[in-house]
Amino acid sequence: DLNFDGIKEDVLFYLGSFGASGTKHFDAYVWNPNTEHYDKIEEFKDIPNPKISDKYKCILSRVYVSSAENEYAKYVCTNGHLIKVAELRQYWKGNIYPERDRAVYEEHFVKANVWKRNLKLNQISDFWKPVVPF
């Protein structure tokens, strides 16, 4: 259920793995009961390594930017479109912040712009845990 409307007939088509880290991309189609056809979610193909979270009703992504940096994003489906609502960046020592072994930054874009800095992994929002390695 890609848009979390309770209809389970949604479909993903694997487009392939790309880049040195094998980033996976998919096309996504959701069943529209009004038209009795599938509607394409255009933004889905741009979400790297998507993971559907039924628990948090969102789609999570992860990208290995480099051996010392990861980026994660949270998307929600609104009016048939996927909107990025949060981002998490993880850096390792020697990359951007040489004084730290690891730096984690979390940002939320909806309602209030929440910015959390220098987090320990146990301080990140719970919805990240399916995609962030511990």
Q: Residue spans of the language-model regions?
A:
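Acidic, small-residue rich beta-repeat scaffolds with periodic aromatic anchors
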Residues: 56-134
